[in-house]
Structures are given as structure tokens and as C-alpha cells.
């Protein structure tokens, strides 16, 4: 997307802020028009490359929740995560210009001007029960489900499936399954997971590198020796958005 179109999307979203702020029902949940949701999710990729303190990023986060979001900071030598548990979002920032990170840095110790957003993780958390809590990593159970659906994935226009056609976008819902992703995006460029007994294996995952999308799947259908046969019915658990490879 060129700069003028990117600016237009950001402007439209900013103009809609007052509607988002006032669209609260009696239960305290956000009620957002479909067009606004599409603009919001389509703008996710435009956030890549921004600094943690950028106004555009702050604006986007304010649209996702009526409450001010304070992230949990997890820093490592090569990256730092800003985890927004209550809105099902995690942002991975990478250092640039020779900036050196260390493990365990606090927010005030970071040089935000030397960090750029490299990847966006979006979480979809199924209803929790005892068996789910026992079999799911504590880091994942801390997240709530991303609040705005459909999540619109804009697909590369340079790609074609075996029939020579491809939709320009995929509207992802909370129950979108493996077969839905493959039907829209075609066979993945990379995939893995699912090996071993279901109790000890990781879920299957697929990556469409040229679209800048990776999808991890959850549930019993995504694990075990039969995972790739049953995976078509597995619902997504985490979607990662990153810069497409060419």
C-alpha cells in the first residue's frame, strides 16, 4: 500500500474514533460497524515498521478497547514483546541501528525510537474448561480473544491458485478452520507440527510467506499422528502477520 492510501486508511479510522468511543451497550461491550472493523483489521499490516510510541499504533490500540491498554513487556537479546492480554494481541519489536537489547528490560528502559514492529500476533481463545487448561500453555491461557471480527487478511494479488483465481481478501471469524484458509490462500509455503501423540505434540501450523501470514491451529484436531488428516476442521488459535517475502 502506498503512503497516500495508508494515510487515507489511518484518517478514516481516526475519524471513526468518536463513534467507537460512544458505541458501548449496557453490558460494556463494544459495538462496531462492519465497515469500521474491516478498516481496522486491514490496517494491521500498515503498523509493521512503526515504533512502540508511534501515534498510529496508539490510535489503533485505542480503537480495540475502551480502556487504556498497558502491555506486559518481555525483552530478550534479539526482540521485545508488548503483550496486550485483554485484547488478544502481542506485538514483536526488533532492534535496529545497532541497538542492543538484554533480557528483562522494563518499559522505561527501552529506546523506543530504535525498535520497529516486526510481527503481530492475534489470539483466538476457545471456551476454557479443565482439560483445556491442563493441556494449554499458561502464556496462551492468559490471552483473551481478539475483540473485532471479521479479521480481514488482505491477500497478495501476485499469487494464483491452481484454478487461476484467488480472492483479494479473507474474512477470518472466530470459527474459521483450516479448510477455509487453504481454500482462500491455497497450499501453504511452509507447514509443521502435529507429530507424536496428541497429548505431547504441538498443533499444526501453516505459513503463507508471500502473504505474510502464519496460522497456528488449536483443538484436538490439530494434534497427534492424524493431525494433517483432521486438521481441515481445526480452528485457528494464533494468526501472525509479518512483512511478505518476495
Regions found by a protein language model. Give the residues of each.
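A cross-family detector of function-defining hotspots
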Residues: 2-246
Amino acid at each position: 500500500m502506498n503512503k497516500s492510501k495508508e494515510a487515507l486508511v489511518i484518517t478514516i479510522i481516526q475519524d471513526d474514533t468518536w463513534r467507537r468511543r460512544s458505541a458501548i451497550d449496557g453490558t460494556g461491550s463494544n459495538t462496531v460497524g462492519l465497515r469500521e472493523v474491516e478498516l481496522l483489521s486491514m490496517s494491521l499490516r500498515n503498523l509493521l515498521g512503526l515504533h512502540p510510541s508511534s501515534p498510529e499504533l496508539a490510535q489503533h490500540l485505542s480503537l480495540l478497547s475502551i480502556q487504556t491498554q498497558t502491555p506486559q513487556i518481555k525483552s530478550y537479546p534479539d526482540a521485545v514483546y508488548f503483550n496486550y492480554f485483554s485484547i488478544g494481541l502481542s506485538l514483536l519489536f526488533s532492534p535496529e541501528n545497532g541497538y542492543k537489547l538484554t533480557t528483562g528490560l522494563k518499559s522505561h528502559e527501552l529506546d523506543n525510537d530504535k525498535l520497529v514492529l516486526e510481527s503481530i500476533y492475534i489470539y483466538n481463545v476457545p471456551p476454557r474448561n479443565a482439560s483445556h487448561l491442563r493441556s494449554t500453555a499458561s502464556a496462551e491461557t492468559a490471552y483473551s480473544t481478539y475483540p473485532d471480527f471479521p479479521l480481514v487478511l488482505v491477500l497478495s494479488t501476485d499469487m494464483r491458485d491452481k484454478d487461476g483465481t484467488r480472492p483479494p481478501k479473507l474474512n477470518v471469524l472466530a470459527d474459521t478452520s483450516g479448510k477455509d484458509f487453504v481454500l482462500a490462500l491455497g497450499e501453504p509455503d511452509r507447514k509443521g507440527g502435529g507429530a507424536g501423540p496428541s497429548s505431547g505434540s504441538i498443533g499444526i501450523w501453516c505459513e503463507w510467506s508471500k502473504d505474510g501470514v502464519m496460522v497456528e491451529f488449536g483443538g484436538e484436531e490439530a494434534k497427534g499422528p492424524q493431525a494433517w488428516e483432521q486438521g481441515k476442521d481445526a480452528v485457528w488459535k494464533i494468526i501472525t502477520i509479518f512483512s511478505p517475502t518476495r
